[in-house]
Amino acid sequence: MDSLTTALGSVPQVVQWALAGVGALYISAKVLSYLHLVLNLFILGGTNLSKYGKKGSWAVVTGASDGLGKEFASQLAAKGFNIVLVSRTESKLKELAKELEAKNGSLKTKVLAMDYEQDNDDDYEKLGQLLSGLDVAILINNVGRSHSIPVPFLQTPREELQNIVTINCLGTLKTTQVVAPIMAQRKRGLILTMGSFGGWMPTPFLATYSGSKAFLQHWSTSLAEELRSSGVDVHLVLSYLIVSAMSKVRRPSAMVPTPRAFVRSALGKIGCATQNVAYTYTPWWSHAIMQWWVENTIGIGSKIGLQVNLKMHKDIRTRALKKAEREAKKA
């Protein structure tokens, strides 16, 4: 201790004051960052949906037949928006349309059975024709695909790799190219694209999915700045795990919300800046706190983070393969 005191005493006082000032600024920045997070998560409300269109205007929801997409459609319908449902299975879409119309009085719906995996230009033409003349206020880019189980990139089936990129990237871009001009013409609109922690943080054993979601992050942020002057708000919505068929998680918890709870927070926190990337928000409180902690401790691209992610997804893969083996023996 005496040697440390002696060493510090030999440092010029002006340097000591400079170091103390830098330390104080660093700590203050972290405290302010956390307070900003808490303010946006628990106190401030998001942009009211009425900014984008009055009741009776239209919302387009992709991947609408199940999970988050179905919940976005349900909650937007309850808020007075007519709904265009886009997904692969026509029977599910028609069933959901009837359900929404029964619950919401004068609600109107339109459906388009569209397999994004096929990347068929005729489907996008049909979407454009379906939307012709409609007052489209909102687009929810929810359609997406992940790996069936975590898998090393070198073992990823080529068809799975292609489908992930085609659906997550091309499908989202082409849909937005159909819908966004309608919004730009009417000088207002909202585009929400579902991101993922898998794209925010590099994720070994989900490399293709991770890359596709990282692509959407940069695309969405760039598009947001392009369309800002047109009155169209564009946001990427980040999440960790949600109870869904894609996540294969069935039991909700503080860290894993139900689709209903997550969508309620997503629609209630539009534009609340819960992280450092512009036009991006993480609406679910525990996800946002975990994100802040990772960014301010180990870092999103650090070797430690990559190693933890790798081990976690290796373990998930091992359990999934063992389960498949047990089920095969029972058959």
UniProtKB/Swiss-Prot annotation:
The keyword rRNA-binding does not apply. It is a single-pass membrane protein. NADP(+) binds at V60, D115, D123, N142, Y209, K213, I242, S244. The active site is at Y209, K213. Its EC number is 1.1.1.330. CDD domains: 17beta-HSD1_like_SDR_c. InterPro entries: 3_ketoreductase_fungal, NAD(P)-bd_dom_sf, Sc_DH/Rdtase_CS, SDR_fam. One of its GO terms (biological process) is very long-chain fatty acid biosynthetic process. GO terms for cellular component: endoplasmic reticulum membrane. Pathway: Lipid metabolism; fatty acid biosynthesis. Its main location: endoplasmic reticulum. Component of the microsomal membrane bound fatty acid elongation system, which produces the 26-carbon very long-chain fatty acids (VLCFA) from palmitate. Catalyzes the reduction of the 3-ketoacyl-CoA intermediate that is formed in each cycle of fatty acid elongation. VLCFAs serve as precursors for ceramide and sphingolipids. This is Very-long-chain 3-oxoacyl-CoA reductase. It comes from Pyricularia oryzae (strain 70-15 / ATCC MYA-4617 / FGSC 8958). The lineage of its organism: Eukaryota, Fungi, Dikarya, Ascomycota, Pezizomycotina.
